[in-house]
Structure formats: structure tokens, C-alpha cells
């Protein structure tokens, strides 16, 4: 009977011997070392050794009897039983044969090396069961006596309250689950950084990205949810092509880190402010980490959940453990979309986990002994949650925490339970009070919101494999990059309108000319710029990188389908609201027909700002390889202006038809339809902007409520101009679509456009399914 097995002798076929976690470590050491996946070595105790331990100490039957009589839904009884059983295990002695084997194996690792002692259950990490965090991990364990003691503590952790409850609710017999202790050489992440990576997007299931969370020090802070980490997405196709692959970065607060304590074990300390303001991983680090993660995913043939660390001494990236991802991998082909229809005040916001909505009564829980106060359907609010809280998490309709990121245990369990969670709010326990009725929404992108009151929402469900054919392409209007992955799951033929205004106003938030003039700007503007651009090489780099990240996120989500990116079309009053904006913007009587679109691009005052936009688009297409991005020019008044814009694009490295670059023109000024042949000689196609075309055809100010009742995209004059544009494009064999609000609001207009032979309609995501089915019904 083997008492221990070196990691290097293990494969995934040994799960029954050393549990899922340790078998996976062995699999990577044996199977992936040649692929330069770096995994620290060590050894594992066996399931046989654990069972021998229980038998020799005559506690096996006693434990089983206690558990058989336990009602795990009685939280107080669960806590008492777990504590008693763990006491029996901790007081027991390790069998002599096991102790001798551990002494020898640890001795062979060197002179009292610091190790992590990890738990690995024999039922853990099977594809259908996530036991994430159910047992303990102990870090910076040094010396044989400490190792022996911590092996016993790991054995006891099989009977943690959360582990007992989890087994019952997932129909595992307690007696059939054994524990293996993994003793693994520590990576000095206390001097570096660490975190968690998933080889898909955890919220949408998007498979072409690696999602990484990262913070300073030992990884337990990220796993426990004790810190708000940095977040990154890395694009797999770009990685494989050797292109710039980092899709998106979000800087976390990273206020604390866990490091070695002087006498062994660990302690938590504050992170320097300069480190908090910087990103914890460079692009080179992210590329190397993602490469190892993708290699692991390919080896296992399924999405993976991976803990990693960067050693602060040798600055290498190491893989600490890997397990199958168990939530999105089980998702079927039925699309479920939650949509908030009611309105309320936002009380707190944080990182969204999942894409659902939940409503209920707030229950603030400050410690484990308050767990039994949580009733079915409550909103569980806490500073942070620990896997120990799992027995009551399943009662909640939503979870809200002050701390934590989207890869902490609380987030993983919330996803598995199918309930929304908003983590890392910073102030939930202060702003939310027991008895408050609230609605928790994770259906609005990366940011999750807690609203006052019980708000109305509805759920749309559709079988994706059952969508009927329609006679034209249904595309989508997308503004928010952080919703692109989930929007891409809807039936679609690409993006007919990607709006960069959302990225500039909501993500960048600073007038581009203020960034260009930095540091020669007013003191208050300078301070705001420095705060927002922390972590980037310069304010200019911040603008270019953030705009590129936003566009790339949308383009990657829908690739290889076309993504038509409309370059900025802010009006002067809209630019005025950005940080630093008032110094650069004129006061116009009617900005709707003023300094906007193409006229801005050719203005000497705006030329350098437009060049930044062009640099971002060039980065997305050339450096990241996302050549599905097509450019669209808004509000072109004259043919000469259109020609000038193409020259400006070329001067900025965006030459039409080079590297398959298509440049589309918005058809939204009546002159565009009236002189369609001339405009189409210049551009690769039209996208009809029904909002502005209606405004300018009927001489109606879209911003004026006094004439709003006359605004009608289906007015015969507007339809006549649309018809002219479609006919001209068809005659020249050029693309013609529509991206205005009209078809989203009026399915009959979409039907009329289809009858005219338009190539595509681009709809708001919330109207894609209804319009698609309406058009299919009209055809039937």
C-alpha cells in the first residue's frame, strides 16, 4: 500500500488515489513540462493512507454515525458536528508508515523547504462537481514537524462545515470521499504577484479569451475575495498568431497583500500606494501566463480554472494547480437573458458575477455565528464571504460583498448556485441595512448594481438552435465593450454599429485635447487626469489603449463576423461634459447640425485628437489582427468632405482596402441619398442612420420635446430617401445596411427594408430576437 506518491508519478487516471487536485498537478508535471508549463514539484499522500489513518485511530465509524444523523440545513447543528469531528481528527496520530514516508519525501525536497500543504478530495474537481475551496490550503509551512501537523489539519478539513453540507447537497456519500494532502514547493509569490485564470469568460462562457485576475503577494487573497484584484482578458487567436493579445485591463484597488510571516505561516500587510495605482502584470507576463493556460486547456480538452503565481525572485510564471471549469462548461444552447424593466436609485455598485437579477430583503452578516439569520430569498450582504458560508449562500437570492473579485470562492459558488453576486463594492455593509428591500442586477455588463426597492424585470429564453432563416442579415448595435461577449451569444451576423462614444465617455471620460495638452492644463483637470490614467505610460497612451481595448473587445467577441466601428460622433455639448471639455468646446445654438462627425476630423483644432482615434483603430487591426473591424464615417455633408476624410485616414495609416480595410459611410444627411452615386464611388458602402436622416429630412430637432410627436422614421419622405440610397448601393454592388433606432422600434419598418433588398438591419440587442422572429413570421 503506497502512503505517498511523488507528483511526477501521477496522471489524471490517479484521481481515486490522490484526488482531483493532486492528480492534475501530476498530470501537468508529467504531460506538459516539455511544453514549458512550469509546475512546482512535491508529493501527495494517498487515499489509502487517509483511510488507514481513520481506521488505526478508530474514528471512521464514529464520524459516519455523526454525519448520518445530521440535518445539514440546521446551521447550528452543522457547526457543532463539524467542530466535534475535526477535533477527533486533529487529536489522532498519523500511522507510523505514513509519517515515515512523509519524512523521507520532505527530506528529499531539500533543507527544510517552505511548502504549501493542499487538500485534494477524491471527488473534487470532477467535471460535474466543483468542490472549489471545500477543504483547506496552508501556505509557507516549513520543517518536518510543521508539515506533519498540517497534513493532519488538511485531513480534518474534509469535515469543514461547508464540505459536509456540499457533499450532502450534491449527493456524495461521506464515506466514499477520501482526502489526499499535497505537499508542494512554494513559489515566492509573496515577493511577486499571483491570482486565478479561467480559459473562458466566466460570465458569458465566451471561449476565445483567457480571463485573468491578479494581485500582489500570495494568491489566497484573490481566492478568498479579501482583495479587489486587477482583471485582464487575453485574446486566444491573437496569442496563437503572435499578435498583441491583451484585450482589456481593469485596475483593481489591491489594498492588501499576504506575505510570509517571520516565524512561518503568513500575514497580511498594506500595499504601497504606488503599487496600488499600477497594474500588477505587464503585457509580457500576461502573454506568457495565457500561453501556459491555453496549453493546459488544449491538453485537458476543456475549459480550465487555474491558480498561478509569479515568483518575485526568479520572475517566472508558475502554475500552482488547475481544475476543470464547471459552470459555463455545463451551459446548454438555451439563451437566458435577464432585463431590468423597473427603475430605482443605485445604492452600491461593484463587479458583476453572472448575468441574472435577484430581489429580496437585505440580511447583513458580519460573522459565521450570524449565518442562521439568513432566510430563503434574502440578499446576503457581507464584508467578504468565505467558503464556510456555503451552507447559507444557497438560501440567498443574491450576494453582495465589500471585497473580492470575480474569481474568488464566493463568485465561483454564486455562479454554481445560479444566483447573481456583486463583489468588491467597498461599502455594501455600510450602505445597505437589514430589512431593506433591494434588487441586485448583474444583467448590465461588468458592473453590478444594487437598486433600492423590488424592481420589475423579465427573462427571455430562446433555443439558439431553433432560430428560423430570414431574408437578410440581422446585425447588432453595440456600445458597451463589457457586454460584447454576452451579446455575441445572441443570433447575429456581426455588428452593424459599434459606437466608440460609450468608450470615450464612460471608460476614458477625458476630453482628448486635455490629454494631449497635459500637463499644461488647470490643476483640477491635471489631478483628475493623473487619477484616471494611473497604470499607463502617458495620458496619450491611456486614450489610445483604452479606445483600442474597447473596440478590440467588441471585435473579438464577434470575430470573424464584420464589426463596423463608427468613429466618434460627439456633438460639442457632449464633448463639453468630459473632463477638461469646457476649455475646448464652442457653445453652439444647435449642436445637432454643428461641429460634429467628419467636419471635426478635418478641423485643424481636432486633427491631433482624431489622429489618436486612428492610432487606436490601427492597433486593433494591425497589431491585434482583428481585421474584421471596418470603419464608418459619420455625418459627411459633401462629396468633397468625404474625399478629404479618406485622405486623412490614409495619412494616419488607415488606407482604404489595404489589409482588407473597408470604409463605410453613414447615410444620414439628405445629400448622401440625393448624391448616393457620387458618395458610393468613394466609400465601400452605406449604413443608413435613420435617426439623423429623419431629423434632417423633416427639419425636426431630435433634442426638442416640442416637436417630438412628429418624429417618424416611417414618414414617406424619409422612406423615399432610404429607398434611393438602397437602390443606388444595389446598382453599384456595394453594401447597404441600416443602424438607426427605427427597425428596433418598428418591426414593420424592418420588413419594408427587407422588401427593398437591404443587406442588413442592425438592431439594439434587446430587440434582436423579437424582430428576427417577426421577420421570419412575415416570410412564412
Swiss-Prot record:
Keywords for this protein: ATP-binding, Kinase, Magnesium, Metal-binding, Nucleotide-binding, Transferase
Note: The reaction takes place in three steps, mediated by a phosphocarrier histidine residue located on the surface of the central domain. The two first partial reactions are catalyzed at an active site located on the N-terminal domain, and the third partial reaction is catalyzed at an active site located on the C-terminal domain. For catalytic turnover, the central domain swivels from the concave surface of the N-terminal domain to that of the C-terminal domain.
Transmembrane segments: none
A Pfam match: PPDK_N
EC annotation from Swiss-Prot or TrEMBL: 2.7.9.2
Domain of life: Bacteria
Record comment regarding domains: The N-terminal domain contains the ATP/Pi binding site, the central domain the pyrophosphate/phosphate carrier histidine, and the C-terminal domain the pyruvate binding site.
Binding site for Mg(2+): 668, 692
Protein name (database record): Phosphoenolpyruvate synthase
PROSITE patterns reported for this sequence: PEP_ENZYMES_2 (PS00742), PEP_ENZYMES_PHOS_SITE (PS00370)
Organism whose genome encodes this protein: Deinococcus radiodurans (strain ATCC 13939 / DSM 20539 / JCM 16871 / CCUG 27074 / LMG 4051 / NBRC 15346 / NCIMB 9279 / VKM B-1422 / R1)
Residues annotated to bind substrate: 499, 566, 668, 689-692
Enzyme class at the top of the EC tree: transferase
Cofactors, names only: Mg(2+)
Listed GO biological process terms: gluconeogenesis
Family membership: Belongs to the PEP-utilizing enzyme family.
Pathway where this protein functions: Carbohydrate biosynthesis; gluconeogenesis
Reactions performed catalytically: pyruvate + ATP + H2O = phosphoenolpyruvate + AMP + phosphate + 2 H(+)
Signal peptide: none
